[in-house]
Each structure stands twice: as structure tokens, then as C-alpha cells.
Amino acid sequence: MFIDRRGFVAAGSAALLSGCATTGTRRDQACSALAPVNVDPSRVIRTVAGLRPYRASGFVVRRDPFGDKALVHNYGHGGAGITLSWGSSRMATNLGLPGHNGPVAVIGAGVMGLTTARLVQEAGFPVTIYTAALSPDTTSNVAGGQISPFGHFSEDAVTPEWRAQFAAAMAYSWSRFQLMAGEKYGVRWLPTYEESRRIEPTAYESFMPDWRVLSPADHPFDLENVVRYRTMYVETPRFLRQLTADVLGAGGKILLRRFATPADLGALPEKLVFNCTGIGARDLFGDAELHPVRGQLAVLQPQPEILYAAAGSWGYMFPRLDGILLGGTFERDVWDTTPVPATIDRIVRSHRDFFGSFRCTA
């Protein structure tokens, strides 16, 4: 995994589904106020569920010969697809483009397909995206959008070489998203509060600026261990719409097409093909290690005064201009993308209990 925030979630969502774990022992201590989220079932404007494409041994960036074509894979990013998109796609294009001449095909129009297509265009090549689904009907649209890798590998299943690949992808994505901050792409910086199982800095502290352990006087939460840092958050529907517009504006094409077998790719005119099919790579290319991990979200009406994110045993809350996201499930091997009302109710209830337990409010 990566950070404690969703370590609570990845542990099985038991804490979330049983309600907020607060003790009440800190209520008489000094307190720094924040505005609480107004968590009321009547404020839920939509519920969604998406499938994270999870591989225990980590995401795949690999070039394979494919008849008279070259096939470059770029998939399997678990819950870190938005976060790692630019870096992983850069690795993929660095594998595919050198020595290539002519147009390029990208399979898939989620965040990996769109960022791969943009990098292909930036390198001077014409590109066509072939996809079975367009935004907003892609898994990427459901993503919460915190720039922080989560749920995309198992510590005991990855190699040192893969860890180096991950670090390089994270570094490039981190720098690229900073250049995109602002309204156009829906990227903004926010302070993030986490209930933490540890109080020492992580190995990835460089991607968590201003990280520090807080005393009870520094926050309003009825929690024992809290850390705070800053990171970027992506309003994914806006981000994906703008990337799509960028691809089309630079002369790219997007065609609706479904591929049932790898042999179907042989009919494409392009000699270089990037596979950015996410969870679809399991069936299309027979990757049995790829498994779905379902995440469910309840989205509340926007609340402009909420200018922070928070996460812990109750779940996680990300504020966006299109709504307040409440999440916290990590359901392995569940293929159904229909939100479960009972689970959504528990997500809402756990967040209502958490924000209702603030020791002081702004």
C-alpha cells in the first residue's frame, strides 16, 4: 500500500462499516477549529461504484512484439490510476516511440489512455484512441482524485526493479500535475488530515509537503494520532473532459470500438499500439493476476467552506467543486458496479458520526 489513510480502508472496511472510532477523552483539550461537513442523507446527490484494476505485483508497463506491430502495455494501477497516470504513460511512450514512424493507436479512453495519447502527440505523432467507453462512463470518472498512490500493489509481491519503476512514475506525475493546477484541469492543493497508525515520516514524504504530527490543540478531531500534509486533488470529470478536448484539439481521433481478442488488434492500421484497457486487460490479454477491487462513494452537495480533506477509520472525505466525496470501501473480486444501498448508508452514517464528534467547529 502506501499511506495510513487508506490502510484503514484496505484492511477491509470493517472500521468504516462499524462507525467512527472516537473515544471522547480529548474533548476538554485545546482545539483548532475546522468547518464540519454537513453529512445528512438528504444532501446525497449521487452514489457511484467503480472497479480498481488491482495487481498484487504492481502495474504493468511492458513492450511486446505483436506480429508486425509493437504492443506496449500500460495498465493495472489499482486505486492509483489518476496519481500515476502521467508517469506511467511517460514510461510507456518511452518504450514505444523510439524508432517508430507513423500513426499510433491507443486502446482505452480512461486516464491512462488519455495521458498516453497526449504524450504521443507531444512527441509529434498522430494518434487515434479506440475505446469501448467514453467519459463519463469510464472507471477513471469514479476516482476520488487524491494525488497519492493507494491500493495498487502488495508489499511482499513486488520486486526492487518494480519499486524503482513506481518511484519514477510517481516523481514524473507529481511534477506534471503541479503544472496543471488551476480551474482549467480541476487540480488544486488542499491540506489533508489523516488518522495515522504511525507517527514517523513515510518513505514518500517528498510527495507529502508540510507533513507533520499534530497535537490535539492543532485539530478538532476526537482522535489519538493525527498527521497533516498538503497534496493535490483532481476533480476527475473536469480533468478527463479537458484531456479529451486536448487530444481532439491537437488533431487526435477517438473512435468507439470494442476488441474481443488480441487478434482483433491486428486489423488496426497503426503499427504501434498502446494497451490502456485497465481492468479490461484481464479478459483481453488473459492477465489472471488482475482483479477488480470495488470502491463505493456517496457524493454530497458541494460545500464551499470545506477546504481540507480527511481520512481514517471512518472512511475518507474529499471536497470537490462538483460535490463532497465520501468513500471508504475496498471490496476485492467484486465485479458489480451498482452501489449497494446498505453500504452507502453505512458510509454516510460513519462520516456523519465523525464530523458530529468535532471538539470545536469554525
Model-derived segments and spans:
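Beta1/beta-strand and adjacent pyrophosphate-binding region of the FAD-binding site
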Residues: 102-110
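Short hydrophobic core segments
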Residues: 271-277
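N-terminal export signals
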Residues: 1-2, 7-24
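Active-site substrate-recognition segment that forms the wall
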Residues: 24-67, 76-84, 90, 111-123, ...
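A conserved short coil-to-beta-strand element within the FAD-binding core of flavoproteins
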Residues: 253-266
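Glycine-rich active-site loop/strand segments that organize a redox cofactor
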Residues: 134-169, 216-217
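Short beta-strand to alpha-helix junction loop
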Residues: 80-84, 162-168, 227-242, 338-339
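Flavin (FAD/FMN) cofactor-binding and adjacent substrate-gating region
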Residues: 2, 49-68, 140-142, 172-249
